[in-house]
Amino acid sequence: MKKYISFIIAFALLICTVAVSVSSAEGNEYWPTNENVRIIGRYSVSGDAVNVGYGLTELNFNVKAESVTCTISTEQEAPAAPYFAVYVNGKLTKKFKVNKGEAEYTLASGLSSNKTTNIRLVKTNERWMIAKIGKITVAGGEIAAPSKAKGKLIEVIGDSISAAYGILATDTETEDDVTTDATYGYAKILADKMGADVNLVAESGKGIYCNYNGEAGKTMPAIYDKNPDGTAYSHTAEPDVIIVNLGTNDVYGMGVNKEITKDNITAAAKEFIAKLREVHQNSYIVWTYGLMNSDMTSVIEEAVSSFSEDGRISFIPLPAQSEFSDGVGKSSHPDITANKATADYLFEKLINNGIIGSGMPGYLETSVDAAWDYDSSKMLGDANNDYDIDICDLVRMNEHSENSDIKIDDGNADYNSDGKIDSDDIALLRKQLLKN
C-alpha cells in the first residue's frame, strides 16, 4: 500500500494572523499577528516570524488573489529538514522540503481574485526540524476573512508513534525527515473523525520517566511546558480531550539503563497526570498505550487509577499493531493502515466510554444535519462549507444522500461514478485527497 502513497500528505489551538499588509510590486505583504491567519498547534513568535516544529502545526488562511508565496527559513538540513504540506481548498497540492537558509516558497498559483481560496500550510515532521515562517505575499489580491475554527480541540501527547515516524517509509534506508508525516497519523485521523482541530505534542524517542536511549531526563513531561524552540508555552488553549500515548520508549529505556524501575515510571506518570490536570482543569484526559509493546500496561493502569476520584481520567489500552496491519513502517513502527485502525479503535472507545457523544461534531445524528444544505458550487467535497475536507464532510454527504431527495453532483461527491454516494466514495475520496 505504501508504494502508492509514499509521497502523500495527510491535523490544534491558538489563533494568530495577519493584521498588517504592505503593498509592493510583487503583491500585498502580510505578517503573522492575530487577525486573518489561524495558527493551529504550538508556535512562538520571533520578530515577524512564527517558529514551528511539531507535526500538524498549521497556518490556515483565506485569500482572494491570483497567487500566494511565503518566506520560510531554517537552520536544519537533510536528513532533518522541515517538510510542509500545502492544501488548497482542502486538496493536497504539494509537499516540499525547506532548504537551509531563507527562501520564498510558492504555496498556490493560478487562483482567481474573484473567489475565496483557502490555504493550509501544514508542518509534517519532527519537533526539532524547526522552521520560521515569515512574510506571506499575496499577488493580485489580498488576504480575506479567516475560516472559523472547528469548535473542538484535542491535544495528543506522545512519542514516535504519535509523530507518525517513518509512516511513509518503504525501507529502512529512507530518510526520516521525508517519511515521518503526521498528516497520515492516527492523531490527525482521530481529530477529523471528531470534527476537531488537533494540537500535536509528539517527539520520537520520548518516554514518561526515561527515553528510548535510557536517559532519565528531557522526557516528554520535561518539555511539555515548552514550545519547539524551548520558549515557554502558555497553555491558553483548552483541549476538550487530551490523549497521552507514552510508555513505549520507557520499555526500551529500561533495557538500556538497568537502574530504572517500574516504580520510577509509575511515579513519573502520576506526576504528569497531575501536571495535565493543573494546567487543563476542564479537559478529559485519556491515557492510551500499546501497539509496539505492552510491558507498561500495569504501570499506566496504576497511575491512572490513583486519580479515580477525578472522574475525567481514564486508560484505553491498545492492541498490538499486528492486529491492525500486516505491514510496518520504518523500524517496525505502525504503518498507515495501523494508524487508521488505531484512530477508528480510539474513536469507538471514546464514544462507548461516554467521553465523546452527540455534542462532538464528528459524532453525527440525523437531527444534527437537518438544517444542512449541500452546496455543490463550493470546493470539491466540502460538504459543510468550512474550506476543509475531513470525515465530517464525508459522513454528511453519505447520510444526507441516503435520507433526502436532493441530487448530488457526481462531479463533487460520487467519486467512483456509480450513481450513488456511499462508503466506497468515502474510501476513494480519502485516498485521492491524500495522494500527491
Short names for language-model regions:
Residues 198-203, 287-288, 357-363:
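Surface-exposed patches in mature extracellular/periplasmic domains of secreted proteins
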Residues 22-157, 162-179, 359-371:
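N-terminal secretory targeting modules
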Residues 19-24, 361-436:
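Cellulosome-associated attachment modules in secreted, modular CAZymes
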Residues 56, 127-128, 167, 172-258, ...:
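Conserved SGNH/GDSL esterase-like catalytic core that processes O-acyl groups on lipids
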Residues 89, 222-357:
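Alpha-helical cap/lid subdomain in secreted, periplasmic
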Residues 160, 189-197, 201, 272-279, ...:
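Structured segments of extracytoplasmic/periplasmic soluble domains
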